Amino acid sequence: MTNRAGTFVSNLSGEMAYESFRPAPLPPNPPIEVSGELLTKLIDANKKIATLEGLSSRIPNMGLFVSMYVRKEALLSSQIEGTQCTLEDILNPLIENNTNRDVSDVVNYIRATEFALERLKTLPLCNRLIKETHAVLLESARGQEKNPGEFRYSQNWIGGQGSTLKNARYIPPNPEDMLTAMSDLEKYINSDDTLDPLIQAALIHYQFETTHPFLDGNGRVGRLLITLFLMEKGILSTPALYISYYLKMNRIEYYGRMTQVRRTGDYEQWISFFLQAFADSAEDAIHTIDRLTELHDKNLKLFDALTKRQRTSALKVFAYLESNPIIDIQKTATALEMSYNTVAKVVSILIDDEILEQTDKSGKAKIYSYIEYLNILRKDT
């Protein structure tokens, strides 16, 4: 079966025979027609992302928001894959003592994101960068058998637990076709296509997921690719857009629409879905920034009653809280190069002002949480 998106090809013979999908290179042929509802959605998505970008440039402590957004995107993207983990798990200051594999996976995703963003400053968005990022993502004991940082040499498939090539929901390109597809995708990413970058990002994500070049981690790398592409194109200046928020909320539709492209060649319905994802995710990010800014300003006023010395220390700890909303005193003191006693006094002030709350009284180290801040970030996780 062949359509605009590609063709299903036969592999092996006899009882071992199976069909894999060979994707057609991008851009689609015939070309994407951007008109009607698609054009309306494109304008709306671009407008909301521009608003988000405007906020990013005006907020002095945007770096703190971005740090949290990277963690939230990592968590949401991992949850799409079935990871059982909470925001509190990955923000816990004693996280290195956590032996939960799901938590380790999300922490690796955060590291992979930070690595890729830094690497993008010196490398174009290419297969080398994608492989290097994948190696960081699977940097754990259970990731070693999945060939971290290497495209696969064997056939993979997508299906439920215990599924085989015979009953798989989808069989990506065989290894030879996969290498061709990834080479074509790399060329497309770095081409001068006249399509709007948001539409290009939707196509690139679809193509990467369809090609499934790795034995594991394809979904997470594929979603990270969206942010990296938009940053390279100058649409985003920071990774402030967590698109996995929308994809998680519409997970079944997300997978179903990709399947529809492969079966019918209908890229337009996929692009329509993705533009809605961009618009809704940008709107949610804007709303979150507004709420966090309001909370920041409200709590900052509480420090006006402090002495100059107390205020200086309190502001340092407060700024730290906005990128680490769950703390213990010792780690905070070390990170800020302050004495234990000074941080302890500030924590006491923040508890009195109802900014901090002691949330773990069972362990040796007392854990304190910035509850209002966490409640805003916790939405949809």
Predicted regions and their residues:
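FIC/Doc superfamily catalytic core
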Residues: M1-T381
